[in-house]
């Protein structure tokens, strides 16, 4: 946890902090010359200005780091009082209704922000993670005055260890909990259930079709697969609406099987005027899907290798 009682921006940078951060960055192999260290406009962070590179924003303990230029939000600041700040323990939880309301009021000039935009607390109190409905992530100060398209990485034992995995997993679990379970097409394990995965899929994605061919085998190994309709290809929204419009889950599974295994699309019945795909697709924006199929364990961990390799079953704990 970050033991800071106030924003770094409220302080000048002490000699001890300056020295500590320089030491941390030298140990992890930062080659660029450090020009200066100053309070960041992101709460509880310091800005490290580098020669020839975008600045770093880093916590006083040197654990959490972001690289990127901060953009000043052009919107008028309508809410001056920032709501109560979260703690590191809330990382990966959706922000409170009060925080979301104040953020959106202060982002009125940004047309791609809406009540559907997901925002989450991060491990850095006062720094919020958000994503557009297209799934593009960004970070912002909780007063919504400064935004960057960077991500929060972690430094541990003198090494960059990549993105904050604890945050990512907790965020993804928050997203799963928000999904309408009745609009997931679920393929239950056909033996004792040993694992549950969520898969963001598109009927026209070649790798999604390849994964779907493994469905019966996965189910037989005790894996329950919950499918999130995540159309990316141009033709997919209408085609997937037809599948999700089928009357019951068995019919939906059959229609999805036909699309994935035979390339046959099932049209929506004339009586179905509801879009059952988009609500969960929008809720899933917080997953920040880069490509389909995106495969997650129910503990929120994203699988990042080939599902055709033995590693996949190892990842699921069912090898």
Predicted regions and their residues:
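Short, thiol/selenol-centered motifs that function as redox-active sites or metal-ligating centers
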Residues: 1-18, 197-212
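Short, non-transmembrane alpha-helical segments in secretory-pathway proteins
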Residues: 3-33, 85-115
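C-terminal cap of thioredoxin/glutaredoxin-like
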Residues: 25-28, 32-67, 71-72, 106, ...
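Mid-chain, structured segments of secreted extracytoplasmic proteins
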Residues: 49-98, 102, 153
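C-terminal low-complexity, charged extensions that often adopt amphipathic alpha-helices
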Residues: 78-88, 168-175, 217
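P-loop NTP-binding catalytic core
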Residues: 144-163
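N-terminal "domain-start" segment that seeds a small globular fold
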Residues: 157-186
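Structural alpha/beta surface segment adjacent to cysteine/selenocysteine redox centers
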Residues: 187, 193-273, 285, 290, ...
């Amino acid at each position: 946890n970050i033991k800071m009682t106030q924003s770094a921006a409220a302080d000048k940078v002490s000699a001890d902090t300056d020295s500590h951060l320089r030491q941390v960055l030298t140990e992890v192999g930062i080659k660029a010359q450090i020009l200066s260290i100053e309070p960041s406009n992101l709460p509880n962070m310091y800005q490290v200005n580098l020669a020839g590179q975008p600045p770093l924003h880093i916590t006083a303990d040197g654990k959490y780091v972001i690289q990127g230029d901060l953009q000043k939000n052009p919107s008028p600041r309508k809410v001056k009082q920032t709501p109560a700040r979260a703690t590191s323990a809330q990382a990966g939880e959706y922000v409170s209704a009060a925080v979301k309301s104040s953020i959106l009021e202060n982002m009125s000039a940004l047309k791609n922000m809406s009540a559907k935009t997901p925002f989450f607390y991060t491990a850095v109190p006062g720094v919020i993670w958000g994503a557009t409905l297209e799934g593009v992530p960004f970070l912002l100060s909780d007063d919504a005055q400064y935004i960057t398209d960077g991500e929060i990485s972690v430094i541990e034992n003198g090494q960059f260890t990549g993105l904050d995995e604890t945050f990512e997993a907790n965020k993804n679990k928050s997203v799963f909990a928000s999904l309408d379970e009745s609009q997931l097409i679920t393929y239950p394990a056909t033996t004792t259930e040993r694992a549950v995965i969520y898969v963001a899929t598109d009927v026209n994605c070649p790798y999604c079709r390849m994964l779907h061919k493994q469905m019966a085998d996965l189910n037989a190994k005790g894996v329950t697969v919950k499918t999130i309709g995540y159309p990316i290809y141009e033709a997919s929204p209408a085609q997937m609406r037809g599948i999700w419009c089928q009357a019951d889950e068995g019919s939906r599974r059959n229609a999805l099987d036909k699309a994935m295994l035979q390339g046959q699309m099932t049209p929506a019945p004339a009586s179905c005027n509801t879009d059952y795909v988009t609500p969960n697709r929008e809720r899933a924006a917080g997953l920040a899907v880069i490509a389909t199929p995106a495969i997650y364990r129910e503990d929120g961990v994203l699988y990042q290798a080939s599902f055709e390799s033995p590693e996949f079953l190892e990842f699921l704990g069912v090898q």
